UniProtKB/Swiss-Prot annotation:
The chain crosses the membrane at residues 55-75, 79-99, 245-265, 271-291, 605-625, 633-653, 677-697. It is found in: Cell membrane. The keyword Protease does not apply. Its main location: membrane. GO terms for molecular function: ATP binding; ATP hydrolysis activity; magnesium ion binding; P-type potassium transmembrane transporter activity. The gene is kdpB. It comes from Bacillus cereus (strain G9842). This is Potassium-transporting ATPase ATP-binding subunit. The lineage of its organism: Bacteria, Bacillati, Bacillota, Bacilli, Bacillales.
Length: 697
């Protein structure tokens, strides 16, 4: 009888357990430090020079000062007890402190991230290559743009640059958090290196691309600390509306005593201040800055560096996303799948010239051709190719190859491009070239034509696959009202097959860099906001033109400088998540604004009857909450007004839950939850507070 096999779960050893416990303990300590710092900052921000930047809370602070002074200047004509003024002033003080705490807490999280980044900025020495070839050691702070530096295994890259010689594995965990090293090599779109990262194997020569204080890490520190944070257009517009409302209510409250005197009664100053504070939108006024800062923080936690809050907001308003096929929609590892000879050519001839065209080609496709030919034991003259002059692939020509020493020109590339090249040299095109190219394209592959001078030998079948789950993600974007456009250098048949399989709305085949700009401009001319991803120098113009340009951290310096967002993980599909974060930011701001304004309805029913009931008994009909007394009603409304701010801080920091759906459906949902909820919650809250306050009055 067979004994049952017992599979044991993998157990953590003691050192691993202690390491995890240390990380948890450090995280708790950091959170505690952030909260402690935020509490101190909330007091420091009481400085009027700081408070005036938030007009709504500045008015509340002025109210606190007035009521605090009145607490020590008793009036014989006032019917309000002395303790009332001091109580109102304390409630107003806490209202301002809670608002300051929300902003300081959001800023504190950014500061914590900045501190961790500063740790990666160590003072290192760089091996600078002088013009005469001598190598001199200098401090990284003395490096300037254009300096050439050699970085060896185990050394830290001293500043941002581009690899001009060599190939090395680089540990970028200090920047990206990803422990797996990445390959950096001269030429192509993966030559960019970042200061503060470590070379873990081999040796590279780089040219410095930034001066001290201008490096990628310097920019990250500046952004996450908030030094470079400016209010976004939407934030400014909302702030203007809220400030205007505050000004209107201020005028109403200031002129109110004129009318009450005419009616034969007076309203105490503390009551007028309480009325003003309850009328103005203090909830959103206290949380507005925190929402914006937290939105940037969420993007940063997602390993995306946003150059401004405007970029994050623009992501939330995106109508069209331009996506590259290779590496974004598909895995991007197009490998040689088979060789197809044309006319009377043989597979050995196709393999021979395909290999010769690829010997000096360091792209994954070129290497896969060599591997395929060697795997099929097809012979070719490697030295012949190595002695020739390599012709790199260009987006404009859509071909690559080699010019041999005897004048022979070998090319491989897109069907249309190679056919045009052969015809320009007087060659004839075999009848089955297009037929076999179409067959490859219909299967979702990419055909590359192999030609020597004016003669076509055959085709290379490159195979790529669509990433799983892409169709579902594009369907989510469609539900959000966002159109997807796939740009690819493939021929129309291949592009159509991939587009259908992935579920994109439109595609642009045989796309050149200028075509991307044309697509972006065409969408923008329709009044739409456009997002796109890119990593190459040829993507830079389109990234700059797009409303949201997401560059890959592994890409070139030109691409990163042109974009307004950089993905530290170099994952092009992350643009979809960035759009979601942008929408979440806008929705959070809108929802809390709706909630704040809806709150005022309950406050009106609490404080207005309390002010006028004694002089106008008919106003008692408005006391639908049956509050204990006029003083209790005023204090209850003020306490709720203050307490709701810290209660909403987690929501402001985290953002409201977002589900892909149409704009109309989102509007209806949020109006129901935050509009109706904004009316109901304060009715309940004020009544509960009134019951408690009534026990002490």
């Amino acid at each position: 009888m067979m004994r049952p096999v017992v599979v044991k779960e993998k157990q953590l050893n003691k050192s691993q357990i202690h390491a995890v416990e240390d990380e948890v303990r450090q995280a708790k300590t950091m959170d505690r430090d952030i909260v402690t710092h935020a509490m101190k900052q909330s007091v420091a921000k009481l400085n009027p020079k700081v408070m005036i930047k938030n007009p709504i809370m500045f008015v509340v602070e002025i109210g606190f000062i007035i009521t605090f002074i009145l607490s020590f200047l008793p009036s014989s004509s006032s019917s309000i007890p002395g303790w009332f003024n001091i109580t109102v002033s304390l409630i107003l003080l806490f209202t301002v402190l809670f608002a300051n705490f929300a902003e300081a807490l959001a800023e504190g999280r950014g500061k914590a991230q900045a501190d961790s980044l500063k740790q990666s900025k160590k003072d290192v020495f760089a091996n600078v290559v002088k013009e005469n070839g001598d190598i001199v050691q200098v401090s990284a702070t003395d490096l300037r743009k254009g300096d050439v530096v050699i970085v060896k295994q185990g050394e830290m890259i001293p500043n941002d640059g581009e690899v001009i010689k060599g190939l090395a594995s680089v540990d970028e965990s200090a920047i990206t958090g990803e422990s797996a090293p990445v390959i950096k090599e001269a030429g192509g779109d993966f030559c960019s290196v970042t200061g503060g990262t470590m070379v873990v194997s081999d040796e590279i020569t780089i040219v410095i691309t930034s001066n001290p204080g201008e490096s990628f890490i310097d920019k990250m520190i500046s952004l996450v600390e908030g030094a470079a944070r400016q209010k976004t257009p939407n934030e400014i517009a909302l702030n203007t509306v809220l400030t205007s409302l505050t000004l209107i209510f201020l005028i109403v409250v200031v002129t109110l005593p004129i009318f009450t005197n005419y009616l034969g009664f007076q309203i105490d100053t503390a009551v007028l201040v309480a009325l003003l504070v309850c009328l103005i939108p203090t909830t959103i006024g206290g949380l507005l800055s925190a929402i914006g800062i937290a939105g940037m923080d969420r993007v940063t936690k997602f390993n995306v560096l946003a150059m401004s809050g405007k970029a994050v907001e623009a992501a939330g308003d995106i109508n069209t996303i331009i996506l590259d096929k290779t590496g974004t929609i598909t895995f991007g590892n197009r490998m040689a799948h088979t060789l197809l000879p044309v006319g009377n050519e043989t597979i050995e001839q196709v393999g021979k010239w395909a290999a010769i065209s690829s010997v000096l080609d360091e792209t994954p496709e070129g290497r896969s051709v060599i591997e395929y030919v060697q795997g099929k034991s097809i012979s070719y003259n490697r030295e012949l190719a190595e002695q020739g002059e390599f012709v790199p692939f260009k987006a404009e020509t859509r071909m690559s190859g080699v010019d041999l020493q005897d004048g022979t020109k070998v090319r491989k590339g897109a069907v249309g491009a190679v056919i045009e090249w052969v015809e320009s040299q007087g060659g004839t095109i075999p009848k089955d070239v297009n037929q076999k190219a179409d067959l490859i394209s219909k299967e979702g592959g990419t055909p590359l034509v192999v030609a020597v001078d004016n003669r076509i030998y055959g085709l290379i079948y490159l195979k790529d696959t669509v990433k799983p789950g892409m169709r579902e993600r594009f369907e989510q974007l469609r539900q959000m009202g966002i159109k997807t456009v796939m740009c690819t250098g493939d021929n129309p048949l291949t592009a159509a097959t991939i587009a259908k399989e992935a579920g994109v709305d439109e595609f642009v085949a045989e796309c050149k860099p200028e075509d991307k700009i044309a697509v972006i401009k065409a969408e923008q001319d329709k009044g739409k906001l456009v997002a796109m991803t890119g990593d190459g120098t040829n993507d830079a113009p389109a990234l700059a033109q797009a409303d949201v340009g997401l560059a890959m951290n592994s890409g070139t310096t030109a691409a990163k400088e042109a974009a307004n967002m950089i993905d530290l993980d170099s994952n092009p599909t992350k643009i979809i998540e960035v759009v979601g974060i942008g929408k979440q930011l806008l929705m959070t701001r809108g929802a809390l604004t709706t909630f704040s304004i809806a709150n005022d309805i309950a406050k009106y029913f609490a404080i207005i009857p309390a002010m006028f009931t004694l002089a106008i008994p008919q106003m008692e009909a408005l006391n639908i909450m049956k509050l204990t007394s006029p003083l209790s009603a005023i204090l209850s409304a003020l306490i709720f007004n203050a307490v709701i701010i810290p209660l909403l801080i987690p929501l402001a920091m985290k953002g409201i839950a977002y589900k892909p759906m149409s704009s109309n459906a989102l509007l209806s949902r949020n109006l129901l939850i935050y509009g109706l909820g904004g009316v109901i919650v304060p009715f309940i809250g004020i009544k509960v507070i009134d019951i408690i306050v009534g026990l002490f009055i």
